[in-house]
Amino acid sequence: MIWNNDDTEHSTGGLYRWTMDALFGRQISPSRKFKEVSQDDTNYNMKSHKDKQWDGHGFQPRTRSSSASFDRSFLQRYELLQDEEEQDIMRPVRSPARPYLSAGHAAGQDAALANDESTDTFSNKRQRFKGKFSGPKYHDESLKFRAPAKNDPFISKLFQRESPEHPSNLPGKFPSPFKQALGLPAGVQVQLDPEEQIPQKMFTDEYLQLLAELDQNGQKLKQLQQGLHQKQQDHILQETSYREKYHVMRQELITELKQSKKLYDNYYRLYEKHKKMRALDTDASRLRQRISDLEAQVVDASIEKAEEVRKLNETIFQLEFREQETQSKHERERIRYQSRIAELESIVESRLSISNGVQNPPLRERIKPVNSSARI
């Protein structure tokens, strides 16, 4: 049952509590827990690493296998290039190195450009990974960026940096005019020949082509930013749509849960009624058995009574038959007695009439009341 606290794999207790926590805000919802875990995975920092907890138990979050992943085994397997700590390759374009700029001024300009996050595309990424690649295994000299030398023929040809023509009468390396100026006392100026001065840069077709490519790259970067902004807007709209769908599904799930609760309540109500009916049915079965026993007893008693009635009827019939026989016997005897009495009366009357010579009523009439009263 889903109402118990059994969280085994064959039970739905955990699913029920998971749903109720998500709907009614008890403890913490799964969506919020997933959001926290996802945010921790995205903003993971090795310095502030803390063990994740889920229901009081520690767990290891799943890492992503990509070049920007927190799992360094991917970089070790495929030997990917590390992110650049400093973008020295962009400095000649944004801030050309000039010999007359001081080192402090150039460093301040580079720091200002480095702190400008609005124009630095990779600033956030560099800041995010800054400090994570500080171990000895990340200091591979073969992967570090090396600025090209000033006497690189490709750079010299690209920016048309001409090599100065030194006088042939000076042996050895031609001395630098800046070093000589540093060695002179204050207020002393060195006059250099126009032929010995450092030639100025010339904006050639290659340089203009490089600027055009930079402009095209800027346009492409702008288009990329617009596309990224559009994707972000689409992502926001998609999240809004997902949120609306989530609320709709959440409301539907709440309705389904309420209906399920109502269904379970009705089920348990019917189950209680079923139990009562089973108890009543047990009592009814006992009563039916009692009725059957009583009916059997009634049938047996009826049979016994019928047998007794039959026997009594037979006895009555026999008695009636005997009575009829007795009555018929008495009737025959009465008739025989009456005939004998009549005969005797006639004899007596004849004798009396002869002896007295007087006509008297018949003897029958004189003795009839006496005989009648005697018979009664």
Curated annotation (Swiss-Prot):
Localization: Cytoplasm, Cytoskeleton, Microtubule organizing center, Spindle pole body
A Pfam family recorded for this sequence: BBP1_C
A GO term from the CC aspect: cytoplasm
Chain intervals for the UniProt region annotation (Disordered): 34-67, 103-134
Biased composition (Low complexity): 103-114
Statement: the UniProt record of this protein carries the keyword Cell cycle: no
Coiled-coil portions: 204-350
Keywords: Coiled coil, Cytoplasm, Cytoskeleton
Family matches, as InterPro entries: Bbp1_C (IPR029330), Bbp1_N (IPR029328)
Role according to the record: Component of the spindle pole body (SPB) required for insertion of the nascent SPB into the nuclear envelope and for the proper execution of spindle pole body (SPB) duplication. Connects the central plaque of the SPB with the half-bridge. Required for proper localization of CDC5 at the SPB and for proper M-phase progression.
Protein family (similarity comment): Belongs to the BBP1 family.
Subunit and interaction comment: Homodimer.
Protein name according to UniProt: Spindle pole component BBP1
Organism: Lachancea thermotolerans (strain ATCC 56472 / CBS 6340 / NRRL Y-8284)
